[in-house]
Amino acid sequence: MTALREGTKAPDFALPAVSNSPAVSKSKEDGGKFSLKDALQHGQVLAIFFKVSCPVCQYSFPFFERLHKAYGSQKVAIVGVSQDDKKNTAAFLKEYGVTFPALLDDPAGYAASNAYGLTNVPSWFLIGQDGEIKISSVGWVRADVEDLNRMLSDANHTALRRLFHPGDDVRDSRPG
């Protein structure tokens, strides 16, 4: 099985969050979960699947945080989907300065990860409001992240934001 590709309908998921955020329901009925279906009513969703022990996840998350600061909460909800427990995920978010919401994919079955056909992390998917995957990427691929930056800029009708800075160790690719 391989990760879902562009043009595929994104499987729905509702996952608990590490902490409350505007993108996460505080409803008692759903247990305070983030619902992909509900989020898509407000805009696109960038779902980034990760493990805290993954060196490529550690490398890439500061760049995803830059995307969040540039475009998040406008017409795109950016969420991490952790394959770890709440305590370790919270420590990861703090260590890497991540401010976007992180969700927990139950390690007992990894239902969301399996639905998306994950073979490696990080794997990420930009999901359009129509529920279709617009971009998917496995590992770190600089060209994919640059394409994502352009798409988010276009979707938000804003100038393209600088994602990479002088002195950044930006590799063309790193397998997950």
Feature-to-residue mapping (PLM):
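Short active-site neighborhood of thiol/selenol oxidoreductases, capturing the structured segment around
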Residues: 35-58, 64
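A short beta-strand-turn-helix
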Residues: 13-45
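Structural microenvironment flanking redox-active thiols in thiol-disulfide oxidoreductases
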Residues: 58-96, 109-112
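Thiol-/selenol-based redox modules, centered on thioredoxin-like
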Residues: 129-176
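Short, internal strand/loop/helix patches
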Residues: 95-125
